């Protein structure tokens, strides 16, 4: 009987862990600098051809490739009287409806509803749009490996 209870408990724990891993931890706080900025970069929003160029695009400017997270946070959350985000209904936020092309977007569709990028943005908005913090991790070094060339020229 004890063995059965222990086995059942282990199976339940494994299923719970697998479910958390597969669906992400919804309670985990999304950080602007380490979670949101990489999404903006991956989708090309802060590239030189889009909102990252010197003049921005259609009244919305981001720092080039996310090098100034505090500037980007202000642009998304505070500029234009906060019209780009709707904390009470994140899925209706302008940054999401433009990125999914639900509302016409000059850059076209950059992501789709339910994608990992979409969910990160939605959870960040719904979670209170936590600002960049002084203790956010920063890149200190990049190492390329291997150090030597491994392919020969022909």
For the regions a language model picked out, list residue spans one by one.
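Bacterial N-terminal signal peptides that target proteins for export
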Residues: 1-10
